[in-house]
From Swiss-Prot:
Its EC number is 1.4.1.13. The keyword Flavoprotein applies. Its cofactor is [3Fe-4S] cluster; FAD; FMN. It comes from Mycobacterium tuberculosis (strain ATCC 25618 / H37Rv). Residues 18-416 form the Glutamine amidotransferase type-2 domain. It catalyses: 2 L-glutamate + NADP(+) = L-glutamine + 2-oxoglutarate + NADPH + H(+). Pathway: Amino-acid biosynthesis; L-glutamate biosynthesis via GLT pathway; L-glutamate from 2-oxoglutarate and L-glutamine (NADP(+) route): step 1/1. Binds 1 [3Fe-4S] cluster. This is Glutamate synthase [NADPH] large chain.
Length: 1527
């Protein structure tokens, strides 16, 4: 049974992902063969599922088939009516036979009430002998019901009502919900068309468990199968897929908001299609509370489909393609999407969504193309779609088409018509169903076409008074607002945050500060809002919705907002809306209502609560009175009336109207004085606002212009710049959570509350939780009152001269916010470690640890309970020399910091036997060998981040640990960045990039879009270095514990929990402050969740984030960590003085700079760093002795040794309840250790490479060439990588001569074929390949070509040969692919050469080197972020310019050198693959070469020109490059 919410564990945070496949006979011919093939496909996807602590209890597997009428007639002892005239479904019932019988009787009563007859029940034959104890203990009773009384869609609708009533009335509940009747009745399906068998099973167990699936009489014309990978191990049979209509590979990121909006829409649904008009109420709530994201998607899809739409129509409403910026889209299709956007927001997130109603079967891919889906069609009408190629052994001679599902595209098989229906036909037919464009023209009201409103200017002293009342500081205006107005972009900062979270601050804080942005990590990816802007949208509408099931021309009667930030005059348009005002010659008919959000400040929290009730009541009254837009305004605050915090007002009204089920009848707009940062705007939208007018920030910008604070720009441009920066910032916040459209983000409330009471959250931010509790309305009112007093002084004559407070959030200021690192602590730390004086070090730690006055961190609220165990003598405690081996330095890249600083840390850690982390910038190979004096500059931990800078086979081989950086504490959900002025030639060489050209790491790893993708990369890295531990770095947030459980199940050796306050070399300032959570919360949740899952003893837990003292380490140990990372502190020890200018390359002490002159100022030494870590270890020993522990392992997870009494001394923090942080869970796995005591099974002994290594032994030992052939299947993953590791170990980075090891494979290569393969290895596949071919290619050669047995008329250049994300992070080598490949080909390629015959969207993204030849079409957004290398595209039809992202590249014609190189390369491709298109081009070279277009990055071209000029003039090339880089 799934545990209920306990401690910090919350079942609502569970995630899953999976493998999915469908097998269908296009002509609708039922056969046993289809069922067998579907089950075989499922077995070949087993590696995409998972098991937990008990291997025989799987995460879930299932199959959906057509109702097997002939089989069922023989299986039951009662007569069945004609096919299609009865429905059936397997019911999951209580285990007790008495309760099961009662449930059956209740279902029968409901069915009869709905006009259906229960024909009978059947006991479903099962065999549970293969199940593990967890699955068996949670196993329900299985009964199959048969219903009659209608046919066709009428039967489907009645069954739907019966099932929904059974769920609502008989107590089906979601995971972890309390109360009797949990999962009393659950129907995987109840239909006359389809039947689902599923459960908490492994893929091999499905057929073994359900004996029906072994019966040869059971037939179908289609089968959809699914293998589940969950982040937990708690069995829940209903959570397995398929669901009633769908099977899903991916995750819906916006599901909370989608469910809230669906709940609000229910009141508008008026239909008699399910019986009488009153019957529709029986269906509500449509979404089962607590159900999985996929289950809720399926429930809404059912409603839309059974409510009258075709299944394809319903799917496209929920997962529309990216139409907003698609300029070449057919206008009718665009109108279809725009119209439906007014009915429903997208269900956004990675999705390969397979669907069926039993006749049509199809799939759709999300707009970003984030899940793999491959399709095969055979000559006898068999159609297969799966997450991978090779799930079925189809003879190549029978396969006539090989396709892929493309972003936003739909694939559909209609078995009634016996054909594949094209995406174009589906959408053209749907677009023609109604006059959508006409409805839009008559209904939508563009904002800029409304009558103009007035904009009032305020004098300076009134603006200052308002700024004080709303908590503005000088720092905010100068560091945040002014740069946004000047530059149109968020300002950048560095070094992370070391100030208290809002609930611990002694200062009044904005309510926004108590909400931290959530972000995607592992279970779904963040999106790239910069390079993939083409699939994003900030456009929205406001003005209310209509009945979802009865659309007409009135359904889109709304105002169109191009983005959510309204200028003052634009808000005035909405305020003064007159229904009789005409737009396009017609009265628009829309009304607005302004509601004042103020309260009498003298009445405190009680007055605030009363005012909120008044505001909510006024909103409800306004809706009843016909208002379609409500404007929540705090503009008229004065001496007596204080503003209600805008976030509280918006969220409070939003949730009140959701509960009233009137929310969708009105749009919410905020006229806000307190919103000025990007985070503020994002929070307001995230909690329900359609638009924001931050009037005071506009007035502040105008005031700064008037006073000359902002210069060189006029008023209009400054305001436009601010709006542009804010909009881009909101888009980035959305993209952190993997959301593409503002409509999906609105109301999704993707935030974590830190330090807010459950009472406030339940009432005003419903759905959010904060296990520790926190501030109440009284405290919020106290913060407002403190600001209000500053604005309205007792003497009115003083008010005009009042100045803003300094701030001090981002930079230390004497009168500002408290910083853990301040001049005094920096001095003490450096003095103690440079002089080796432990006594002075203790003075430093006392300053940091002394929380009696400054409770600056959550750990500051904790104290040690020294009486729990008797103390032990210090000499009996584990020595410092052993403890220090648990320490590592945080990941700091070479490039962000200087070589001197980087190597100082490495030398010190290697001397101690500890570990340094090289960060994401690669490492100079010269450091891999020891220095003559015995020192070692090699970093023990090599990081693998999203850009894969410098990640080669040689790099991966030279380490003890490999760390996958999923997120960074200072900026989770974002990529890294290294400005061009810091990319000196020596940095570029290590990163395999171009000197002087700025580098940006993509926000996602493009090979990790889900938990099973992470498992694949862990497997890749373990193959690349079998002796290295593989780490996964996560950032603390709600739910990180369940992600960590998934990481453990994915076989990582170490999971790192980073705090939100980690350091960075460069990040937007708002990210630094408002994303992620304290590590104390994430670490405690991780420990508790791993224990509950029985996974704690198989994985090491590490923590980092502003660790500064032995006390910090001891508290982290007691909360569950056994290893510890330090970054800022050792950097300070090495000389950093916290100037926070790392991103500018101006570090005055030579730490965070590449400037040779500044680097000369570096004074750090390894000995200083050694002293620091030994001092920390000694302090830890002292604490261990006091607490009665002899070793660190004894102390790990012993949270009972901590107490929370210190929290009572803080005016806000005394309301925190830290008991959940210290909770010690009871687990079903009681024998497990609280620390890692066993090893993960990586399954390397089963790898195909073990055979390849044996067969290649002569080459590995002596360099003698070997050549051989073998077969390969999709289950053979990461082939060639371990072989490459052995070659690299023997021969280093130079490898062997090309082709020394030459292997030919026949079949379908599994994921990551040829990953990191070094020079000397050639791999050929006759067949096809999956995703990630040539990932990190390090000099090897890969050829993929169709099988020689392919049909004679097979046109390779029209068919798929490889998957997505091919050549990701390749640094050298060659790849030749005869055919078309998927999305993101050559992403981050930095040196490899490749030829391919067509690519999907986002080709050559972030490419920094190498050359790519494309002998076919490209998808959209080609060359986005491409800063180096060259692409040659064969473009006879002139389509490339329309698909090109021209921000960083330009198109050129070939010169003579280009033509010669291209001819030779195509010839090599033809020789390797027998390419027909290549041969056609070569045979008419003089005529065809003019059709090639050269794609050239501008910065790369500029650097090449600088090099050429320098060489011509005989000047220093490096200086010339950097001169060009610096402008």
């Amino acid at each position: 049974m799934t545990p209920k919410r306990v401690g910090l564990y919350n079942p609502a945070f569970e995630h899953d992902s999976c493998g999915v496949a469908m097998v269908v006979d296009m002509h609708g011919r039922r056969s046993r063969d289809i069922v067998d093939k579907a089950i075989t496909a499922l077995l070949n996807l087993e590696h995409r599922g998972a098991q937990g602590a008990e291997p025989r209890s799987g995460d879930g597997a299932g199959i959906l088939i057509q109702v097997p009428d002939e089989f069922l007639r023989e299986a039951v002892d009662f007569e069945l009516p004609a096919p299609g005239s009865y429905a059936t479904g397997i019911a999951f019932l209580p285990q007790s036979s008495k309760d099961a019988a009662a449930a059956c009787a209740a279902v029968q009563k409901i069915a009869e009430a709905e006009g259906l007859q229960v024909l009978g029940w059947r006991s479903v034959p099962t065999d549970d002998s293969s199940l593990g104890a967890l699955s068996r203990d949670a196993m329900p009773t299985f009964r199959q019901v048969f219903l009659a009384g209608a046919s066709g869609m009428a039967l489907e609708r009645r069954c739907y009502v019966v099932r929904k009533r059974a769920e609502h009335e008989l107590g089906t509940k979601g995971p972890g919900q309390d109360g009797p009747g949990r999962e009393t009745v659950y129907f995987p399906s109840l239909s006359g068309q389809t039947l689902v068998y599923k459960g908490m099973l492994t893929t091999p167990q499905l057929k073994a468990f359900y004996l029906d699936l072994q019966d040869e009489r059971l037939t179908s014309a289609l089968g959809i199968v699914h293998s589940r990978f969950s982040t937990n191990t708690f069995p829940s049979w209903p959570l397995a897929h398929p669901f009633r209509r769908i099977a899903h590979n991916g995750e819906i990121n916006t599901v909370t908001g989608n469910e809230n909006w669906m709940r609000a829409r229910e009141a508008l649904i008026k239909t008699d299609i399910f019986g009488s008009a009153a019957d529709v109420e029986k269906l509500f709530p449509i979404c089962t509370p607590g159900a999985s994201d996929t289950a809720r998607f399926d429930e809404v899809l059912e409603l839309l489909h059974l409510g009258g739409r075709s299944l394809a129509h319903a799917v496209l409403m929920m997962i529309p393609e990216a139409w907003e910026r698609h300029e070449s889209m057919d206008p009718a299709r665009r109108a279809f999407y725009q119209y439906h956007a007014s009915l429903m927001e997208p269900w956004d997130g990675p999705a390969s969504m397979t669907f069926t109603d039993g006749t049509v079967v199809g799939a759709v891919l999300d707009r970003n193309g984030l899940r793999p889906s491959r399709i095969w069609v055979t000559d006898d009408g068999l159609v297969v779609m799966a997450s991978e190629a090779g799930v079925l052994d189809l003879h190549p001679s029978t396969v006539v088409r090989r396709m892929r599902l493309q972003p936003g595209r739909m694939f559909l098989v209609d078995t009634a018509q016996g054909r594949i229906v094209s995406d174009e036909e589906i959408k053209a037919d749907l677009a023609a169903e109604h006059p959508y464009q006409e409805w839009l023209d008559n209904g939508l009201v563009p904002l800029d076409e409304l009558p103009e409103g007035k904009d009032v200017r305020m004098p300076h002293h009134r603006i200052v008074m308002r700024q004080l009342a709303f908590g503005y500081t000088y720092e905010e205006l100068n560091l945040l607002v002014a740069p946004m107005a000047r530059l149109g972009a968020e300002p950048i900062g560095s070094m992370g945050t070391d100030t208290p979270v809002a609930v611990l601050s002694q200062r009044p804080r904005m309510l926004y500060d108590y909400f931290h942005q959530l972000f995607a990590q592992v279970t779904n990816p963040p999106l790239d809002a910069i390079r993939e802007e083409v699939v994003t949208s900030l456009q929205g509408t406001t003005g209310g919705e209509r009945d979802l099931l009865n659309p007409d021309q009135n359904s889109c009667h709304q105002i169109v907002l191009p983005q959510p930030i309204l200028r003052n005059h634009e808000l005035a348009k909405l305020v003064s809306l007159d229904p009789n005002d005409k737009v396009n010659g017609r009265p628009h008919g829309l009304r607005s209502k302004v509601i004042r959000c103020l309260y009498r400040v003298s009445e405190g929290g009680a007055g605030l609560a009363a005012a909120l009730e008044e505001v909510r009541g006024a909103a409800a009254a306004a809706i009843a009175d016909g208002a379609r837009i409500i404007i929540l305004s705090d503009r008229e605050s004065d001496e007596e009336m204080a503003p209600i915090p805008s976030l509280l007002a918006v969220a409070g009204v939003h949730h009140h109207l959701v509960r009233e089920r009137t929310r969708t009848q009105v749009g919410l707009v905020v006229e806000s004085g307190d919103a000025r940062e990007v985070h503020h705007m994002a929070a307001l939208v995230g909690f329900g606002a359609a638009a924001i007018n931050p009037y005071l920030v506009f007035e502040s910008i105008e005031d700064m212009l008037d006073r000359g604070v902002i210069e060189g720009i006029d008023r209009t441009a400054a305001l436009n710049n601010y709006i542009k920066a804010a909009g881009k910032g909101v888009l980035k916040v959305m993209s952190k959570m993997g959301i593409s459209t503002l409509a999906s983000y609105t109301g999704a409330q993707l935030f974590q509350a830190v330090g807010i009471s459950e009472q406030v959250l339940d009432e005003y931010f419903t759905g959010l939780t904060c296990p520790t509790g926190g501030i109440t309305l009284d405290d919020i009112a106290a913060d407002v009152a403190a600001r209000h007093r500053l604005a309205y002084l007792d003497r009115p004559d003083e008010r005009a001269h009042r100045e803003l407070e300094v701030g001090g959030e981002y930079q230390w200021r004497r009168e500002g916010e408290y910083h853990l690192f301040n001049p005094e602590t920096v001095f003490k730390l450096q003095h103690s470690t440079r002089t080796g004086q432990y006594k002075i070090f203790k003075e430093y730690t006392r300053l940091v640890d002394d929380q009696s006055e400054r409770m600056a961190s959550l750990r500051g609220l904790l104290k040690f309970r020294t009486g729990v165990r008797p103390p032990v003598p210090l000499d009996e405690v584990e020595p410092a020399s052993e403890i220090v081996k648990r320490f590592s330095t945080g990941a700091m890249s070479y490039g962000s910091i200087s070589a001197e600083a980087h190597e100082t840390l490495a030398i010190a850690m290697n001397r101690l036997g500890a570990r340094s982390n090289c960060g994401e910038g690669g490492e100079d190979v010269k450091r891999f060998d020891r220095d003559p004096n015995g020192d070692w500059r090699r970093s023990a931990i090599k990081q693998v981040a999203s850009a894969r800078f410098g990640v080669t086979s040689h790099y991966l081989t030279n380490c003890t640990d490999l760390q996958i950086k999923m997120a960074q504490g200072a900026k989770p959900g974002e990529g890294g960045q290294l400005p061009g002025h810091k990319v000196y030639p020596w940095v570029a060489e290590v990163r395999h990039s171009t000197p002087g050209v700025g580098l940006i790491s993509p926000p996602p790893h493009h090979d990790i879009y889900s938990i099973e993708d992470l498992a694949q990369l862990i497997h890749d890295l373990k193959n690349a270095n079998p002796s290295a531990r593989v780490h996964v770095k996560l950032v603390s947030e709600n739910g990180v514990g369940t992600v960590a459980a998934g990481v453990s199940k994915a076989h990582a050796d170490v999971v790192l929990i980073s705090g939100h306050d980690g350091g960075t070399g460069a990040t937007p300032l708002t990210s630094m402050k408002h994303a992620g959570a304290p590590w104390e919360l994430g670490l405690a949740e991780t420990q508790q969740t791993l224990l509950l899952n029985g996974l704690r003893d198989r994985i090491v837990v590490q923590v980092d984030g502003q660790l500064k003292t032995g006390r910090d380490v001891m508290i982290a140990t007691l909360l569950g960590a056994e290893e510890f990372g330090f970054a800022t502190a050792p950097l300070v020890v090495a000389g950093c003085i916290m100037m926070r200018v790392c991103h500018l390359d101006t570090c005055p002490v030579g730490v965070a700079t590449q400037n040779p002159l500044l680097r000369e100022r570096f004074t750090g030494k390894p000995e200083f760093v050694e002293n620091f870590f030994m001092f920390i270890a000694e302090e830890v020993r002292e604490y261990l002795a006091q607490l009665g522990f002899r070793t660190v392992n004894e102390a790990v997870g012993q949270a009972g040794a901590l107490d929370t009494t210190l929290a009572r001394a803080h005016w806000k923090a005394h309301k925190l309840d830290l008991a959940p942080v210290l909770h010690e869970p009871e687990s079903a796995f009681m024998n497990q250790d609280l620390y890692c005591s066993s090893r993960q099974d990586h399954g390397l002994d089963k790898a195909l490479d073990q055979q390849l290594i044996v067969m290649s032994r002569e080459a590995l030992d002596s360099g003698k060439p070997v050549r051989f052939s073998t077969t390969i299947g999709n289950v053979n993953r990461t082939v060639g990588t371990m072989l490459g590791h052995e070659l690299t170990k023997a021969y280093g980075g130079q490898g062997l001569p090309d082709g020394t090891i030459d292997i030919t494979f026949d079949g379908s290569a599994g994921n990551s074929f040829g990953a990191f393969v070094p020079k000397g290895i050639t791999l050929r596949v006759y067949g096809d390949a999956n995703d990630y071919v040539g990932k990190g290619l390090s000099g090897g050669r890969i050829v993929v070509r169709p099988s020689d047995d392919a049909p004679q008329d097979y046109v390779a250049e029209d068919n798929i040969i490889g998957g997505n994300v091919i050549l990701f992070g390749a640094t050298s080598g060659e790849v030749y692919l005869r055919g078309v490949v998927g999305e993101r080909f050559a992403v981050r390629n930095s040196g490899a050469h490749a030829v391919v015959e067509g690519v999907g969207d986002h080709g050559c993204e972030y490419m920094t080197g190498g050359r790519v030849v494309i002998l076919g079409r490209t998808g959209r957004n080609f060359a986005a972020g491409m800063s180096g290398g060259v692409a040659y595209v064969y473009d006879p039809d002139g389509e490339l310019p329309a698909n090109l992202n021209s921000e960083m590249v330009e198109l050129e014609t070939l010169d003579e050198d280009d033509a010669d190189w291209l001819h030779g390369t195509i010839q090599v491709h033809v020789d390797a693959t027998d390419s027909a298109v290549g041969q056609r081009i070569l045979s008419d070279w003089s005529g065809q070469q003019r059709h090639f277009v050269k794609v050239m990055p501008r910065d790369y071209k500029r650097v090449l020109q600088a090099i050429a000029l320098a060489e011509r003039d005989g000047v220093d090339v490096d200086k010339a490059i950097m001169a060009a880089a610096h402008g």
